[in-house]
UniProtKB/Swiss-Prot annotation:
Gene designation per UniProt: Ago2
Annotated keywords: Cytoplasm, Endonuclease, Hydrolase, Hydroxylation, Magnesium, Manganese, Metal-binding, Nitration, Nuclease, Nucleus, Phosphoprotein, Repressor, Ribonucleoprotein, RNA-binding, RNA-mediated gene silencing, Transcription, Transcription regulation, Translation regulation, Ubl conjugation
Protein name per UniProt: Protein argonaute-2
GO molecular function: core promoter sequence-specific DNA binding; double-stranded RNA binding; endoribonuclease activity, cleaving miRNA-paired mRNA; endoribonuclease activity, cleaving siRNA-paired mRNA; Hsp70 protein binding; Hsp90 protein binding; metal ion binding; miRNA binding
Compartmental location: Cytoplasm, P-body; Nucleus
Enzyme class: hydrolase
Family of the protein in this entry: Belongs to the argonaute family. Ago subfamily.
InterPro entries in the cross-refs: AGO2, ArgoL1, ArgoL2, Argonaute_Mid_dom, Argonaute_N, PAZ_dom, PAZ_dom_sf, Piwi
Any Gene Ontology CC annotation: cytoplasm
Organism: Rattus norvegicus (Rat)
SMART domains: DUF1785 (SM01163), PAZ (SM00949), Piwi (SM00950)
Amino acid sequence: MYSGAGPVLASPAPTTSPIPGYAFKPPPRPDFGTTGRTIKLQANFFEMDIPKIDIYHYELDIKPEKCPRRVNREIVEHMVQHFKTQIFGDRKPVFDGRKNLYTAMPLPIGRDKVELEVTLPGEGKDRIFKVSIKWVSCVSLQALHDALSGRLPSVPFETIQALDVVMRHLPSMRYTPVGRSFFTASEGCSNPLGGGREVWFGFHQSVRPSLWKMMLNIDVSATAFYKAQPVIEFVCEVLDFKSIEEQQKPLTDSQRVKFTKEIKGLKVEITHCGQMKRKYRVCNVTRRPASHQTFPLQQESGQTVECTVAQYFKDRHKLVLRYPHLPCLQVGQEQKHTYLPLEVCNIVAGQRCIKKLTDNQTSTMIRATARSAPDRQEEISKLMRSASFNTDPYVREFGIMVKDEMTDVTGRVLQPPSILYGGRNKAIATPVQGVWDMRNKQFHTGIEIKVWAIACFAPQRQCTEVHLKSFTEQLRKISRDAGMPIQGQPCFCKYAQGADSVEPMFRHLKNTYAGLQLVVVILPGKTPVYAEVKRVGDTVLGMATQCVQMKNVQRTTPQTLSNLCLKINVKLGGVNNILLPQGRPPVFQQPVIFLGADVTHPPAGDGKKPSIAAVVGSMDAHPNRYCATVRVQQHRQEIIQDLAAMVRELLIQFYKSTRFKPTRIIFYRDGVSEGQFQQVLHHELLAIREACIKLEKEYQPGITFIVVQKRHHTRLFCTDKNERVGKSGNIPAGTTVDTKITHPTEFDFYLCSHAGIQGTSRPSHYHVLWDDNRFSSDELQILTYQLCHTYVRCTRSVSIPAPAYYAHLVAFRARYHLVDKEHDSAEGSHTSGQSNGRDHQALAKAVQVHQDTLRTMYFA
């Protein structure tokens, strides 16, 4: 089962568990990869020339605290001007907007703390701030040079931070900073997304250490902002009114709830006090309209009377409200009862939208932002020219120069693996540009389907019996060709309505039809029925379900039916195809388990829902079949809390499936940012070791821990136009880079394993944080690329290895399992899985998959 020719890997060198507090060190790069044909590329990295000087780091303390960064920057700007003669002279300090200030020459304050008073001219009255400055340290750029050339073991974090602040100082004052990007409203043309939101374009910028050089990573970026507009217009967009005139009555409860959800937390400015445009943050929307909403008003006599908002505006501001039937915004602190009519408020410009975009907004966003690779390359070059870092006075102050041209990189295009099918002819497919097809091929192991049912939740007048009959015939034909014969008609084919009928119907099916293998469920577009089908099928009754959209039943195509068969065969225990055993890397010579792990977090702006951790493990030698484990954990917790128990479950399952104990564990971990590497590695590597030792004291398989990152801004472009692939002109599938733009000393590489269809391909970044198995670069890169070809849902290579992708699917499916029928409205909750006050135990039970589903790939 685990045989195969090829060189034997260095046997794993398990290290004993370190003492707590010991920091694991990622392994050094073993070598550089050599396999594959070379390809000339350009990367959106720009070489920086850094002098070997010291930078002086000071800590600022601004009182009163909690000012936005923008205000802090203004304070520092005023401070530098005001105290030019006494302290700053001709120096141009740079500031991160919080506490850190850097200068190229020391300030004449020695090591003492200096207290200064700074006045900011404000609207109405000036504001006075107290600022203290204290020396922190000397940041040596010489040390950075030593680290980049490998003379120092690790890159000093404080130098990267200092350089980043230098490079960001001017853009932060010119544009709206968001994370590591800068945005600005599009001049003259807006890009509306609907619902009061619009697209802003900008650029991402970060300083990155690489082999021998510091690099500046520059990319185009886009995000959603709220449109600066009157709140009256915002209401119309959110509630789909053509104009406010068509709303002559007060808002209904559901309209008010929807509006509140959108406007809560946003800043508005008032328009009824002339030049005094005070800004407030919205904390709520009143239930009552302005004509009825009262508040306690203190009169001159000292008496307090209840007064309506409409009356107050008429008496105090001589303003008769045009829309007294609309509610008010409650602003500031909830207990203070400050109410503003909608019509005197505007949405403040430059507020980023952190709430989840709707499906329509997301697709509009993608259409607005997708750029072919050559277009993106040109846009980045344009950005570099307009940023002109070499004339930026702050960058020059520190003696930094940035090259204008993108960095030339030599990449390699890896050979795709051969894919083996089954049936009589055991056909072999060879992917071309990451794609192959199943025509004239049969599944490696096809499942025979004897007892199956259809439940149609689409209305009968739209999805008729004729449609169902034709769909059934076509599906049976395609499935027979694919080697997954569906014998006979469905044992049950009925129409149903609404999520409430799912469980009774499924119970009836399970009790009535012995040996029922599959329920095909037809859905009318987006509906809460989907979540309920998966909850009941996966967690309550343990039944295999396959949902199909009504439009794909009304009009069948061989492609959609074939895709359905890929999913059905796997859910029922079949194997679609395998990697050709002779072509697999040597790691397969001994029993090996591939684990994929991911944590998904609830959408921003949602403080209650739990995060969901999922870990999947391979269950055969191909590797094709996987088993899943899933847990709910603390909101926004990135480390997988219960990893030891999850890995233990998967190792037991692997042993039951194969009768082998894996001698190696290859762990692909998705969703970790660089800042969390150390923390995640420390906790999770120990957890995997603990899982092994709990099974057997002496059991110490070699562990390789690889972080997979998709959310980065590295983009690669073909230097030679003839190498470009497809309409979007992307790099070919299999393109790998492990030199020049990668880490100076650690083991990392970029691999673009998929064929880009829309926009510019994003290569995945792999960073090896631990490696007992002593992989060479070639071995790990080939293995990773091959695993990207084992994803069962399609006949193409995907952008990350199948185990990491499956972990993502499992966590995403668990969100549906958490949808609480009793409390969740279908609107907006379809994947949000609200936890509505359910305790941890109830949530944990909700994601627990049924015993019969546990060993299947229900998530496929």
